[in-house]
Amino acid sequence: MQVYVYKSRRKPDTYIYLARKDDFEVIPAPLKQVFGTPEFTLEFELTPERTLAQEDPESVLASLRERGFHLQMPPQNERPL
C-alpha cells in the first residue's frame, strides 16, 4: 500500500499516515485541531514486511484500511531526567 506521511507543526515527533495523499477529510475534527496544519514529509510503499522506526507495519496498515489514517505519537520517555 502506498502511504503518505505528514508531520505536525504543533506537536514534535507526531505524524499522520494517510492512505490517500492530502485526504485530510478522514481525520476527525478534534485531531485536526490539535495536530495543526500537516506538513508533507514522506511517501513510500508500506508492506507488512517493512521495518518502521517506531510503529508495527501491520498495525499501521490495519489502521489505514479501517480509518484511512494512522496517528504516530512520540515515543514515551521511560526514564525522564
UniProtKB/Swiss-Prot annotation:
InterPro entries named among the record's database cross-references: YcgL-like_sf, YcgL_dom
Superkingdom assignment: Bacteria
YcgL domain location: 1-81
PROSITE patterns: YCGL
Matches recorded under Gene3D superfamilies: YcgL domain
One Pfam family from the record: YcgL
Protein name: YcgL domain-containing protein Tgr7_3126
